[in-house]
Design a protein with these regions (language model features):
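Active-site neighborhoods of enzymes that stabilize oxyanions during catalysis
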Residues: 18-31, 128-187, 194, 269-286
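N-terminal intrinsically disordered, low-complexity segments enriched in P/E/S/T
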Residues: 22-75, 79, 94, 174-185, ...
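A short, acidic, amphipathic alpha-helical segment used as a generic capping/interface helix at domain edges
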Residues: 210-223
């Protein structure tokens, strides 16, 4: 995905359910000012992935509701395309996603949209609570849009399954990254994985640190931005989804998400590694 410094570049025109036709390529992270501008111009679909009852209380203006649990229930390529169509999202339409869970749910949804071919997807730089605490606009209107058409173009290059992960250990240039908290990682993890706790990649109300900070952080872990990196977490790819976008933001070109993560790995009886004699310093993520 082409990244620019909060610079949203115009690409082309297309249909967008009666809204402004100008489509723009979004950066990985969309800040509040940029999103407010896009909302005013009616050139974006905002997606709220919190629980339905939270959305009904209030939300970012024009946002549609996609509770994260609903996405998991339809988590196949065809099912996700149906969701995009139901939300009135067409190919190339700019989509900005937010949550109230430090960006983890939004990241998993954004990655899923990209996996089925909707590449013009960004994460809101902040959570909804932070948006509200800054005094930014909210509304209670339940937003719906006419059902759209959307093509299916699965991007296998950003996904890893258990077999791929298992074979990765034979390739030194492929690095596994466990995004869980340090103690969970030390208790047990996929052999050879490095730990980048999700708690270390956000900062100052933002769901992700800036690109240079993330790059420095991963390099301190002995991870090269030239490597192929596979992220995973404990269950359904939320924490590792956030790590996925942190790595992309830092300039890592080849990142994959093992979306079924450690829960599937254990259920398949795959090998695990642990630190039986971990001490206080082992718990430090720095």
């Amino acid at each position: 995905m082409k990244k620019k410094k909060e610079n949203i570049s115009k690409t082309k025109k297309n249909e967008s359910n009666g809204e402004n036709n100008n489509h723009f390529q979004l950066p990985i992270i969309c800040n509040a000012d940029s999103l407010r501008t896009l909302i005013r111009k009616k050139t974006v679909r905002v997606v709220d992935v919190r629980k339905a009852e939270d959305y009904q209380q209030e939300h970012v203006p024009t946002a549609v509701s996609l509770p994260f649990g609903d996405l998991l229930e339809k988590d196949t390529p065809v099912g996700i395309i149906d969701i995009l169509r139901d939300l009135g999202i067409v190919d190339k339409m700019p989509v900005v996603i937010y949550d109230d869970t430090f960006g983890a749910l939004a990241a998993r949804v954004a990655w899923t949209f990209q996996y089925v071919g909707h590449t013009n997807t960004a994460l809101l730089q902040m959570t909804f609570s932070h948006w509200k605490n800054q005094g930014l606009e909210t509304e209670k209107k339940i937003n719906t849009f006419p059902k759209s058409q959307h093509s299916l173009n699965v991007n296998h290059n950003i996904h890893a399954d258990a077999s791929y992960v298992e074979n990765a250990k034979e390739h030194p240039d492929k690095i596994l990254v466990d995004a869980r908290e340090r103690l969970n990682f030390l208790t047990e993890h996929i052999p050879g994985a490095k730990n980048i706790p999700y708690t270390m990649i956000g900062s100052n109300g933002n769901i992700l640190r800036n690109a240079e900070e993330v790059k420095r952080f991963i390099e301190n872990r002995g991870i090269s931005t030239d490597s192929e990196i596979i992220t995973y977490c404990g269950s359904v790819g939320t924490l590792s989804g956030l790590a996925y976008y942190a790595l992309k933001l830092a300039g890592v070109k080849n990142v994959k998400l093992y979306s079924k993560s450690f829960r599937e790995w254990k259920s398949l009886g795959k090998p695990k590694e642990e630190f039986k004699d971990a001490n206080y310093w082992d718990l430090s993520a720095e």
